[in-house]
Design a protein with these regions (language model features):
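Alpha-helical transmembrane segments of multi-pass small-molecule/ion transporters
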Residues: 1-310
Length: 310
C-alpha cells in the first residue's frame, strides 16, 4: 500500500514544486495565479466531480458509511480543538487560522492522489469525500469565524456561504444526474471531461505558487498545534470512525488520505475575508504542504499495521 501511495505522491509533489518555481522565478507573473485558482475552483474541479459522480456506479460505493465516517471524525476533532482553545497562545483571529489548519483540506492534492491510487474509482470516492466534508468544514469554519473572528456573519450569510460553494454544487449536480439516470449530452460530455482533467495539474501548480515560507517561521507554536491535529488527531479519528462504519480498504484509504491532507490555499482567502489572521494562515499552509510529503506516507505506514489493511 505504501509503495503506490509514494508513487502517487511523487507527481503531485513535482507539480507543486514546479508551480512554486514558476512564481518565484517570475516566469509566470503574479497576476496569473489568482485567476488560475479561481478557474480551478469555480469551473474545473466542479466539472471533475460532476462528471465523476454522474458516471459512477453509486450503488458500488459506500456513500453513507463513508460520509458518516468523514463527518463524524471532522466534528469530533473540531470539538476537541475547541476544548483546547485556552491552551493555544493566540488571539481569537489567530485561533480561526489554527482551526482552519486543523480541519480544512486541499482538494487538488487529494483528488490527484485518489486518481493516482485507484483511477476512476478513486475520483468517485474523492467526490463522495468532497460532498461530505466540504459542507461540514465550511459550516464549522464559518461558525468559528462568527465566534472568534474580527468579522461577524449573519445566519443568511452562513447559509449562502455553504450552499453557493462550487464544489458542493458540482457534487450535487453529479449525484442528481446519477439518481435521475441522465447523462451529459454526447457533444458536451467530452468537454466536461476535458475541463475536469485540467483541474488537477493546474490546481497543483496553483498550490505551489501560493506557498510563502517566510511566514511559516514566525508562528511555530500555533502552526505545530494545527499540524498535530491535522496529521495525527484527524487520521486517528477517521480510522476509528471508518472501522466503526465498516469501510473497506479502498474507501478507508481515500478517507484517511483526505483527512491527512494539508490545508487548502483558499484558507488564506477565507481568513482575509472573514476576519482571521491571514499571515498565520499563510504560514500554516506553507508548513503543512511541505510536511505532508513526509506526514502522509508516515500516517499510512503506521496505520497499515492495523487489521483494517490486512
Amino acid at each position: 500500500m505504501i509503495g503506490p501511495i509514494l508513487l502517487a505522491l511523487a507527481p503531485v509533489a513535482l507539480l507543486v514544486a514546479l508551480g512554486h518555481g514558476l512564481r518565484r522565478t517570475g516566469f509566470i507573473g503574479d497576476a496569473f495565479w489568482p485567476h488560475a485558482e479561481r478557474l480551478c475552483y469555480y469551473v474545473l474541479l466542479p466539472a471533475l466531480f460532476a462528471d465523476g459522480l454522474a458516471n459512477a456506479r453509486l450503488q458500488a460505493l459506500p456513500v453513507l458509511p463513508l460520509a458518516a465516517a468523514l463527518v463524524g471524525s471532522t466534528v469530533f476533532v473540531s470539538m476537541l480543538l475547541l476544548l483546547v482553545r485556552r491552551f493555544v497562545a493566540v488571539d481569537g483571529a489567530g485561533f480561526t487560522s489554527v482551526f482552519q489548519g486543523a480541519v480544512r483540506f486541499n482538494n487538488y492534492v487529494g483528488t490527484a492522489l485518489a486518481a493516482g491510487l485507484f483511477g476512476a474509482h478513486g475520483i468517485a470516492l474523492a467526490a463522495v469525500c468532497v460532498a461530505a466534508i466540504v459542507p461540514t468544514v465550511n459550516l464549522m469554519c464559518v461558525l468559528v469565524f462568527a465566534r472568534y473572528g474580527d468579522t461577524r456573519l449573519g445566519a443568511w450569510a452562513l447559509v449562502r456561504q455553504i450552499l453557493s460553494n462550487p464544489l458542493v454544487v458540482g457534487c450535487a449536480l453529479g449525484i442528481a444526474m446519477q439518481v435521475a439516470g441522465i447523462a451529459f449530452p454526447a457533444a458536451v460530455e467530452p468537454a466536461v471531461r476535458a475541463l475536469g482533467a485540467a483541474s488537477m495539474p493546474l490546481g497543483l501548480l496553483c498550490v505551489g505558487a501560493a506557498l510563502k515560507f517566510d511566514s511559516a517561521r514566525e508562528w511555530m507554536q500555533p502552526t505545530c498545534i494545527a499540524s498535530a491535529f491535522k496529521f495525527m488527531a484527524m487520521p486517528l479519528a477517521t480510522l476509528a470512525a471508518g472501522r466503526l462504519f465498516g469501510l473497506g480498504d479502498a474507501a478507508l484509504t481515500i478517507a484517511l488520505l483526505f483527512q491527512a491532507l494539508p490545508t487548502s490555499s483558499s484558507s488564506y482567502i477565507m481568513a482575509r475575508q472573514l476576519g482571521g489572521d491571514a499571515p498565520l494562515m499563510a504560514g500554516i499552509t506553507a508548513f503543512q504542504t511541505i510536511a505532508a510529503a513526509l506526514a502522509m506516507p508516515a500516517v499510512l505506514t503506521a496505520l497499515a499495521s492495523t487489521p483494517v489493511f490486512r
